[in-house]
Regions:
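Carbohydrate-active enzymes and regulators
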Residues: 1-104
């Protein structure tokens, strides 16, 4: 008998692969803002029941930061300091097929 089901939301950033780049930027803007809403809504829950989000690439997060409101920035930082929102260290995902000449 199944006693517990764990759900994990997952997103993946393929800039320009699944949709044109402007569409991907808009989608990730929505993802970040929805993550802020969910993290705030669940912040008072027990730690194992809180919503947590990691922005997968810094490129999307930097674009969102540049174009969002001061209120959203403040909310984002507050949640970051609580450990509910974080940002990965890679600006973009790079294909493992790239050699050093393609990266430079």
């Amino acid at each position: 008998m199944i006693k517990e089901i764990l759900l994990l939301h997952h997103s993946h950033t393929d800039i320009g692969y699944t949709s044109p780049q402007p569409v991907i930027f808009e989608l990730h803007k929505r993802y970040i803002e929805e993550a802020i809403e969910l993290a705030e809504k669940n912040a008072s829950n027990e730690p194992n029941c809180q919503f947590k989000w990691t922005c997968e690439v810094t490129g999307m997060t930097m674009d969102w930061w540049k174009n969002t409101t001061p209120q959203y920035r403040k909310r984002f930082l507050k949640l970051h300091h609580k450990g509910l929102i974080d940002v990965a260290g890679c600006k973009w995902h790079m294909t493992p097929l790239m050699d050093h000449q393609m990266i430079i």
